[in-house]
Amino acid sequence: MIKYLSVIYFLFSSILFSDTTIVALNQVHHSFGGLGNNRTTTSEIQFPNSSTDYSSITMRVNLECPTGGCDPWDRKAKISVYHIDQWIEIGRYVTPYGVECGWEIDVTDYRSLLQGAVILKSFIDTWVQPGWLVSIEFDFVEGQSEYPFTIVRNLWNYDRLVYGDPTIPVDISTIQEYLPNDTEEAYIRITTTGHGQGNTENAAEFSDKRHDILINGEVSHVHNFWRPDCEFNDCSPQNGTWQYDRAGFCPGDKVDAQNLSILDFSLPGNTVEFDYVLEDYFNQCSPNNPSCVNGVTCTSCAYNNTGHTEPFYYIGSQLIIHTTNKHSNADVYLSISDQDTSISSVDIYLENYVSVYGVSFKLDLSLLEIQGDGNLSFEDGVSGRAEESNWTVSTNAEGLIVALAQGTGEPIQPGEGILTRIQLNLENVSIVSGFLKIIDVEASGYFGSQLSFETGEPTIFELLRTNEELITPTKITLHNAYPNPFNPFTTISYD
């Protein structure tokens, strides 16, 4: 019997959690010219509803030549997904010089983004009509993952960060993020590639520079992203100068992101400050350099479309956090904590990765059944992180809740815990049951900037309002006991 049950369980598990391949794009033409601007394509892709039951996720990218041949030049390209009001890069590559190639990219760390209906964007920086035929597939391999729950937070993302020009100063923002208490592993995932040539030191494509990553004001990592192995590229032979080593990439290859651990520099439950500082560099060949002399300082002081182009960096990065429990990727996460039926109140839980300067939301009562002659209403919020930050939490009869810093009130710093407790007024209400959920959220950051948010699932809400009038019985009936041949008598004690 045990053997048969094991076989049934195995078959059932195989049906539920089998390997899955999702075809995202199938020979989609990326081009520019007479066919229009098709350098970017977006599609809605249906991924598995949950990705926690897969041990790994691999993205396979394949480039083919359309009729007339491939783009003869190497072009930067990336793949992104739209998640909670922002694009997140999940893979990058550089096309080969005029030949077909393909690559596999491990995207397991993006599992929280690759579930349900997702908008995917594929971009190739091509400027010619032949372009490329792009196919993208995702292979989900069933099994137990080392880290089934992963948070993804965007850090520095610049499509064109000009390098070495004092008239266009580099301004890479300092970023603060919060590490939840149940963090198991955390690292910066960064992808930097250099572009532009014919400049001082042939920057930024052919210049080996090292940049600093600072954690809490101290240098934690020296970012060495130079590719010294382009001549050994599997996508060979190609046309062009594919053998030459470059800053962060090789033509005809995927761009490998680097994972830089941070738990040696900050512990879970704390806010971390990140900085990315570029190595000092001055491009004497810039047309913005008044001291540049053609044929003396450099071959040419003017940028052109051939051998002298502006040096810049193409930067994409995220904070990857592996946790014991499921978390949101949004700036702000609001939910209703497990209800204590012994008290007539609702605790609102807040998890925020960034500082919050104001928040409003509504408690939706439409899914509640209220019995009695009265109405359910709310009192202003008390205690919790809001009170600790000298905030006021106001409510109205419709369930709207507004929490703001007042006077000397400070923003609520990144962290997790109870935001506030909302007391319920239950006069002439006997029973409240059903579902309670948070809707219509607005969250503000510094100077009123809009923060992204997610809310928890509707919470089962059951509350029995008892008082002496309600519990006094008006009629008592005693029925026969259910027949029991082993104990035909029933005794009911009464005090």
PLM features per residue range, with description:
Residues 1-5:
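Positively charged n-region of N-terminal signal peptides that target proteins for export
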Residues 6-18:
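Hydrophobic h-region of N-terminal signal peptides that target proteins for export
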Residues 19-328:
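Extracellular/secretory-pathway and virion-surface proteins
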Residues 327-471, 475-477:
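Acidic, low-complexity intrinsically disordered segments
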Residues 470-495:
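Short loop/turn motifs at secondary-structure boundaries
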